[in-house]
Every structure is written in C-alpha cells, then in structure tokens.
C-alpha cells in the first residue's frame, strides 16, 4: 500500500515561495482581518448556552397555596402545556404568589417562545379569579440565573416607601429598557400605599361589616372617563375630584349614616401612609434597603449589558435626593473580566514558552523567528472567523487559543526542520525550500486534517454540552487550519530568504551545548530503539497493558460535570421553622447577617425575607454574599462556605444553605444547594410519605451534605369549618364569609390611586395587633338576611391544622425537589449512583418517578455520550487517515498511540485530585489529535524510505525514528509548554482551566516516552501482517491460474 508521493518542485508551496510580495500581503490581510474581528468580539464568561427560559409571575395577596394552585397555576399550566417546543414546565404556588418557569428547546428562538407564552396567558385570562389585582406578568429570564448587578439603595432622612417609589420610577424602569436586561426586581417591598386598618370592635358596635366599608372606599375613589362638552365655539373636557390620593382624604370619607349622623372612616379605622406589603424587607449588610437585582435575558452579552447600565447609572443617581445612597454591591462582570484577563496572560505566557522551546531546538535566531511568526498569525487570524461565526472572547475560546499555541507551530517546525536539513547538506536555500516544502507538504496536510477530524464529532453533540464543545472545537480547528496555510505559504518563503548554510552552522556556546545534548539523547535513543525492535513482543505487551490500564482508570476515576468555580459570590438560603412569623424571621435574618459579615473573607451581603416572585415561603430568607477578591483572602469558596455554616450553626432554630455562584447556569429553579433531583407523583399524599423517607436515607450516605427538600407541609393552617346550614338560614353565603376573611387578613388591595407617573393601592385589613392570634376571628362580623350583625364564631369553628407552605408542580404533576451538596472528596458521579441506590433501598413505588435536574441532568447526558464521543473521534480520524494513506493498516498503526495518551491524562487527573469532567474530556479529545502526530511523522518518512530508497521496513522505520526524533520532541514540548500555563493557573476561574492543562501535560509526557518505542514495533507488526496477507493472495491467484491451464484455458 503506497502513500501518495509529494508533489515535485515545491507542491502547493511553490507559488508562494516564488512570489514573496504576494505571500507577505496575503499574511498581512489575515492579520488585519483578525485585529478588526478581535476589536468587535464581545466578552463573556462562557459561550452562550442558555435555554430559552421565561418566568410567569402572578400575585394574589392573601390567597393560600391551595387557592393559588387551583385558581391560577392550574389554568395557566393547561394553556402552557399546549405550546410547541416546551422542554420543561415547573411551577411553585405559595401563599399569595404563583411562579411558573418555562424552559424551551435550545433550537427555539426566545422571541418565538415569548409570543407563545403571551398567547397562552390571553387564552387563560377568563379562567383566572376576577379579583386578581395584577394580571400574570412574564419575563424573559431564568430565575436560577444570578443577577449580573445588584444595587443597594439606602436612605437616612426619607421613609423607605418614598425611596422605593423613586427607585421604581426613576431607576428601575430606565434600567429595564437597557438591551439585554431580562428582569429588574426590587427586594424590600416598600411600595407606597394607603393602609386602612379596621378596628373590628368599633365596626361591630356601629352595626357595620368590612364588606360595606370596602364597597364604600371603592366607590369613593374612581378614575374613569367623564366625557366632554362640545359647544358652538369651544370644547370643554370634563374633570372631577373623584380621586382621593392621600391618607388624610380617606380619614374624612363618610362610609355610612346612623341616626342621620355621618360615620367617617377614621371612626372605625386607622388610616396611614405605609407599604403595600408590610411582610417584605431587605437589607444591605445590616441596614434597611431597597435591593435591585438585575438579571439578563438568556443568550445576551453580560459584559455589554452591565457596561450599558453602569454608563447610565450616574445620571440616574443625580435625579435622587442627596440623602439617598446607591451602591453597586455585586458586579458579576468583575470576575468575568478578571478570569478573561488571566487567560489572556496565560495565552501570552504560552506563546513565550513555545518560542523558547523552538529556540532551544533550532539554536538560531532567524530559524526561530520563522515558526514563531506562525503563532500570532494563526491566533489573530482566528478572531476574524470567530466574529463571523458569532462567537465571543470567553474562557473556552481563549483556552482553545492557548492550547493552539502548541499546535500552530508544529506544522511550521516540521517544515523548517526539513528545509534546514537540505540547506545543511549544501543545497541552495531556494532549492532547499522547494524540495523540503514539497516533500513535507503531504505530511502537513495529513497532520492538519487528522487533527481537525478529531474535533468533528464535537460539532454534532446536542444540548448544553454540545454548545459548549462547539465554540471551543471550531475556534481550535480554525487556528489549526490557518497554521497549516501559514506553514505551506509563509514559512517556506521565509526559509528561502532568511536561512543560509552559514547562518545555520553558526553556533554560540548555548547552541553547541544543546547540540551535544541532543546528539547524546539521540544516540542513547538509538541504542534503546534497537533493543526494543529486537524484543517486539515485550513492547507489544506494554502497549496492550496501557490499553487495559486506560479502561481500568476510566472506570475508577471520579466523574463530574463542570469544575466548581470560585467567582467570589455565594448564594444562601436561610430556613426557619415552618410556622415562623415575619417579624421573627426578619430578626433571625439579621442575626445571621451580622455573623457572616464578621468573616474576614466577606466584603458585603444583601438579604431579604417575605413572599414574592423570587422567594416562595415566609420561613425562607435569601442572602447574596460578596467575597473579597482572591488576592485579598486566603481561602477558596469551599472552605469559606464550611466556615460560615459552622459560625451560623450556633443560632437556634435555623439552617443555612450555601452554594457558590457559577458562570454556567442550567437549572431553572433557585434551590438551596447545588444539585437537585425531583420526585413526581399523582398526589400530594404520596409525596408527603416518600419525600421525607428519601431525604432521611440520603442524609445517612457519605457522598452528601446539606440534604434538604422544598417539601414543606407543616405550616400552621387555621381551618374555618363553616356550618353551612346555619349560615344559609341566616342568609350568609360562603362568598360573604370569604370576603370578610379576605378583608380582615389578606392585605386586600381594594382600590387604585392613579397619578401621572405611577399607580398606588389602598390596602384593607383588620388591626390584628389589638387582638393577636386566633382570637382575631372573634371580631369578624357578617350581615345576616335581616340586616343584623352575625359573629363568624356563631356559624363556624376554627381548627388548627398543618398544611403545605407551597405546592410545586413539574410538567403539571405534583412534585418535590430534593437538593444536596457534595461532601468533601466525593464526585457527582458517586452521588448519582448513591441516589439510585437509595431509591432501591427504601423501595420507592413505581408510580413515583424521579428525575435529576439542571447540572446533574446535564452530567448524566454528558457521561452517557463521553465514550461514544471518544469512539467517534477515533473513527473519524481513522477514516481521514485511511483516505489520505489509501490504506487500512497504516491508520491503525497511528491510532495505536492513543492508549498511552489516555493513561497519562487519567493518571495526571487522579494524582492532582481532579475529576473526569467536561473540560477534562476536551483535553482527552485533543490528546487523541496531538499524540498521533508522532506516529504520522515516523510513518511518512518510513514509507518514503521504502518507496524511494528501497529500504527494508526495519531499516526504514529505524531511520525514520532517528531522523524525526528532534521534530517529534520539539512539537511535543511545544504543545506541552502551551498547556503548562493552564495547568499552573491560580487566578480567577483557574478551576475551569486546570483540568484541561493537567490532561494535556500528563498525556503528552507519558505518550512521548512510550510512542517513540511502541509505534515502530507496531509498524513492523502490521507491515509483516500486510505482507503475509499479500503473499497468501498471490499464492491463491497462482493456484487459480494453474487450474485454468490444466483445464486448457488461458489464464485471465
């Protein structure tokens, strides 16, 4: 089987060698295009891999979780469930709020999803409660995605209700208009309102009820059209004093007459300017504040969005009074920028190390400059392709370019080394360039396309992992392709004009010492190689052992999804007993905040309590902890989290759950801990039985810590058991009872005050401080059929029960989410296996289905495709090599080098305590492409020696190994030193980059040592096998010819 001979006279390089001006201008064009592309590229932490996600929030103050579920969530879910492209629908119905999160397929544009959601909301409108104060509101945002910016607004001389009003109208609305902003939430809930607190005994004494008062207030405050008068000469618009806008006006409102005397609202109630919801509060550190959390839309440029907000912020702050202070407490872009800057530094360091390696081997300044120019040209030129493909400058693309520094010089090194060999033999530089480039051209093409073939399977991966791989793979492939073009055009042209026999023979002390060292190494390698070739079966057993060891290590190594990053930001959830009151929860929250702020690694924090669209239950408080920069603290996030939890453990009755904020957010729900899986059943009763059992079982298992669930069914419920017969006899309907209860205890929004810039509400409630607890029910009065007051206690009894604080659905069925963190020293793979085992041990019924969520689900998908991905890469490379060599055998020889790389990578990961995760898998895929280069360079020269010089296979492969030892060692060290900065990185985001560097360095070291010996032995083995096969075929053909002659036939 013959390899295609090199094109005589320079091959594809001939035109570029003979036309230096055109070649130079061509390279300048590539460089300029890359510079322009670089300046236009956006910057982000990772490639945009967000699922199109929309959150629908519906507020219904005073409604229980049961009422919210049945009257709001269920009708909306039925409509949403009919949308095409919907991947998952999760809902959480709590007291006063319904939150539905819709996650769509990656291929569905977000704008199309938005249109479908709006249509579904419109279709469900007639099924929603008629007294719903606000329609369902949707936002193009993932609720689990942490805010890109957090602003804290505090004031000393102005009430927080006024501060909230100014922030909402002057800041929040303007920020919402910025391109890329998905949602601006105001935590703290101090929206201005007129609060009417009824004095229940006074209302009863005057023979009134709350419904009469509610109706009077609603009728007294209206803002409707009144028409206009159109006379002969002029037109007059009608207006009236039909609105009441302040608490003072409401105090004098006449709500009824008794014995001809007016009863004013202030006679039966306390009226004050207050907050619309007085069970919401937020703090910046320990100071009361309005906290603005700004979240991005899925798929937008974080840096550009944050920069736009920061540019407009000074002007917005100027519109506020001087006593109002606005601070940026969290800016996620600071760590993104720091991480990208660190990778850029590592890229420059990798370039410097690679150039140093080239100089040590070539020992000549001119010869070093030529391949060194290939690095900036290839890398900068790649930016142009990245721009046209819609990529960004992020950790993965910069990692690809860093790794590419070791790749892109390989081709140039091979070319210059071959040309230098002919110049040193005495040939003219131009002839040497034409001859050397023509001879090596096919090898360059083989190296390039076989390496790109490794990356092809990455392009066809689906889901989140596929999106992550794709940008990395394409960036690397483009850099490799440009480097091949440079090596076949610019490199030989420069060799013809910059190299000479004298310059190559000119040596200094360093070059002479390195020359002696390399000669010594090659001499010893030659001796060792002869011994190995004379004992092939021992070498083959070593090669087979590496294959077996690779499989064993793959099975044993801990497996994860994505490295845990230290971005300097921690999300926390504080959990208190399910029956805790708002004031008690706020007090506990402040206790915890004070403890956390004492930690030396903590810079600031924001926290809030209360039920809104982001927090489901009153017994949960949310915290966002900002850490000091890495340079100002000694510990990483895992140690800080452990320390904070230990510090807070002394506060009675609370549990603190913490998790580090990550750049990659796949989850759709904001959970207490990092990993989640759900249990889904047909009824809440089944979940109430099995969720606690499973949580208890997991708490006993080693891989887990902070195991918890969102199943909370021990909230106190005051059940009003109405005697329907008695109520009917008195002419009291259930609607009247519900209205009376809602008026008393629901912070009912009964009227709207319209102004030029905003709308405010009138809130009705009983003054429960006068009669706290269940005794407040004794003050409820209803009006019977005879017009007389009827105490609620005469027709109903109050029973204390337990009930759910929230009701969760997944794809319209009741569900509960169990969440956990990993214990120190355990991997996500071990945790997944432990969950499966726990389900079997507690004998979970078949009608309760479990499913991992978020990053755990993505981990399972990635784990399932990893092996097939590696196999696909090997098959793709075999096909390309088979086509290039027109051989079935030689590609197998080349691919036999791969197990050595796998052993080195897996051993390096285990020794450094890293998991086999997505980033490490990228490293292994790249090793498959790099390591086979050694075999290609050996086999190309061996085949050429057999064909052109008539050498035996033994002599040919022996000479090829010695002749190619120097370029093999040079290219391997270039790739190794290119990966070294990633392995040794310590800055922001280093956790993301280290596994790739560790894989590359470990794999290259082991494979370099082994493939120099195993490849020639396997080459001879397959050559012998091929010759034996050809011999048998020849004997068979001769036998056929003989039989034809005996039968009197001419041979065919």
UniProtKB/Swiss-Prot annotation:
Cellular compartment(s): Cell inner membrane
GO CC aspect terms: plasma membrane
Keywords recorded for this protein, A-Z: Cell inner membrane, Cell membrane, Membrane, Transmembrane, Transmembrane helix, Transport
Pfam families tied to this protein: ACR_tran
GO molecular function: xenobiotic transmembrane transporter activity
Residue numbers spanned by region Disordered: 1032-1052
InterPro entries reported for this sequence: AcrB_DN_DC_subdom (IPR027463), Acrflvin-R (IPR001036), Multidrug-R_MdtB (IPR022831)
UniProt keyword annotation of Transmembrane helix present: yes
Membrane topology (UniProt): Multi-pass membrane protein
Residue ranges of the TM segments: 16-36, 342-362, 373-393, 396-416, 440-460, 472-492, 537-557, 863-883, 888-908, 911-931, 968-988, 1002-1022
Family listed: Belongs to the resistance-nodulation-cell division (RND) (TC 2.A.6) family. MdtB subfamily.
Oligomer status and interactors: Part of a tripartite efflux system composed of MdtA, MdtB and MdtC. MdtB forms a heteromultimer with MdtC.
Family matches, as HAMAP family: MdtB
Record-linked NCBIfam families: PRK10503.1, RND_permease_2
Protein name: Multidrug resistance protein MdtB
Species per Swiss-Prot/TrEMBL record: Yersinia pestis (strain D182038)
Lineage: Bacteria, Pseudomonadati, Pseudomonadota, Gammaproteobacteria, Enterobacterales
Gene: mdtB
